[in-house]
Amino acid sequence: MLISIISQGLVWAILGLGIFMTFRILNFPDMTTEGSFPLGGAVSVTLITQGVNPFLATLAAVGAGCLAGLAVGLLYTKGKIPTLLSGILVMTSCHSIMLMIMGRANLGLLNTKQIQDVLPFSSEINQLLTGLIFVTLVILLMLFFLDTKLGQAYIATGDNPDMARSFGINTGRMELMGLVLSNGVIALAGALIAQQEGYADVSRGIGVIVVGLASLIIGEVLFKSLTLAERLVTIVVGSISYQFLVWGVIALGFNTSYLRLYSALILATCLVIPSLKDKYLKGVKLSK
């Protein structure tokens, strides 16, 4: 059970990392997440059931997510459609696209080789190592990218768009690039989770943005004054912590049909804690 919870936390952390690219760096509330996440699962599962190598299927899923990000980016930067509306439009479109890809509302992985099956250990250990390898790879690639001149221009766009433009940075292109990369990472999470769970479903994206945000917020509540690398690692810690919280809710006997409600309550609590701490504990010193 412990290994299973950590495995889920590691893979779901990839979703949090993708959301971090837009929500925290660009200050862009991208609703496309709830479309690109299940889209990644739909593409990977469909290709795997047709005999495609699971690594290639996962790569194709990332490409599909990038296309979803490109669509919302063009609607926002070129079409001048507001952020939330452009995300909702693409998210809604993804639902129909997934039905076209799978030919049905859900599709299972039976008697197929999945990405974690490449490893020679038990199923639980394979899933744990797969999650650890992929989340580490995503963090390293993000750190490498954000340390380049292009990455610094991307960060500057999110920090202060007007100042970035004064330095000759094309902020529209930076936003477009960020949405493409972010949704590619989110689709990767969707592909890995679909393979971990053994199926893809068009409704799998409902509420996943709450899970991703919970990973960010829990990590930020637990840790303060961090470097970029440390912030990315805290997303992983936050994701695993969130999975333990969900497991605790289920273990207490609560109805699992209301899991999305519990998820929203957990996120709301984590968002409220910092403000309550500032309001009631500011300036309070504990006696030795």
Residue ranges and their predicted role:
Residues 1-53, 58, 75-79, 217-224:
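Single transmembrane alpha-helix segments in multi-pass membrane proteins
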Residues 186, 190, 196-261:
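Transmembrane alpha-helical segments in multi-pass inner-membrane proteins
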Residues 83, 87-90, 94-147, 177, ...:
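Transmembrane helix-bundle core of multi-pass membrane transporters
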Residues 68, 124-209, 214:
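Helix-loop-helix "hairpin" substructures at the membrane interface of multi-pass membrane proteins
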Residues 8, 84, 127-132, 175, ...:
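Loop-to-transmembrane alpha-helix initiation sites
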Residues 19, 52-92, 97, 135-136, ...:
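Alpha-helical transmembrane segments within multi-pass membrane transporters and channels
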